[in-house]
């Protein structure tokens, strides 16, 4: 859903379902006249076939506090977003480096269970810094929580920051 497209049509068979909606809140306006109308989230009645849904709850998704070591990973289909991705890379001698997120959308990144920061395709910087202290000789694990682009399948390492 967007500011311009405020409804969602679901074609599903009759039954009992649980609907989960993720509302991201990045990108607040910090200048100009729009600063007065800079709300994020769901507004107004939430309805199904014109009838208001009641007793629904909103909870924060505290992904930055998530212990990625406790997650279970499975196969993902195109369009399964948001979702977590996990991969590994080898490093002979741990040193400061950057993980390029070119081709990814927006999300959060961990290396060896250590949260390193957020990334967004709209930013000039297209990489996340990885300090040598987080890395190990041999196999290292990278986890991404991707909000937009589930079709991407790889990241790359760079000695320098990556820019648009």
Give residue spans per PLM region.
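Glycine/proline-rich low-complexity spacer/linker segments in large multi-domain proteins
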Residues: 24-54, 149-164
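Terminal leader/tail segments of proteins
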Residues: 128-164
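Edge strands and adjacent loops of beta-rich recognition modules
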Residues: 60-85
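Solvent-exposed loop and beta-edge segments used for protein-protein assembly and interaction
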Residues: 2, 11-15, 38, 78-83, ...
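A structural detector for beta-sheet-dominated domains
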Residues: 11-13, 22, 49, 92, ...
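A cross-kingdom feature marking solvent-exposed beta-strand/loop segments within repeated
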Residues: 1-16, 28-29, 96, 115-139
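Aromatic-lined ligand-binding clefts that engage carbohydrates, nucleic acids, or primary amines
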Residues: 19, 89-112, 119-120, 142-145
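Low-complexity, acidic Ser/Thr/Pro-rich "mucin-like" tracts of secreted and single-pass surface proteins
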Residues: 51-52, 57-58, 63
């Amino acid at each position: 859903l967007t500011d311009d497209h405020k409804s969602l049509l679901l074609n599903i068979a009759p039954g009992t379902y649980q609907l989960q909606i993720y509302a991201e809140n990045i990108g607040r306006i910090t200048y100009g006249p729009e600063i007065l109308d800079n709300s994020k989230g769901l507004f107004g009645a939430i309805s199904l076939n014109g009838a208001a849904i009641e007793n629904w709850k909103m909870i924060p998704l505290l992904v930055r506090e998530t212990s990625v070591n406790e997650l279970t990973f499975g196969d993902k289909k195109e369009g399964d977003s948001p979702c977590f991705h996990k991969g590994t890379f080898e490093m002979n001698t741990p040193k400061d480096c950057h993980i390029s997120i070119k081709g990814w959308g927006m999300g959060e990144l961990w290396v060896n269970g250590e949260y390193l920061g957020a990334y967004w395709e709209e930013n000039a910087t297209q990489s996340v810094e990885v300090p040598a202290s987080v890395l190990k000789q041999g196999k290292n694990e990278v986890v991404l929580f991707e909000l937009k682009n589930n079709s991407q399948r790889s990241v790359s390492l760079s000695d320098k920051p990556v820019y648009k």
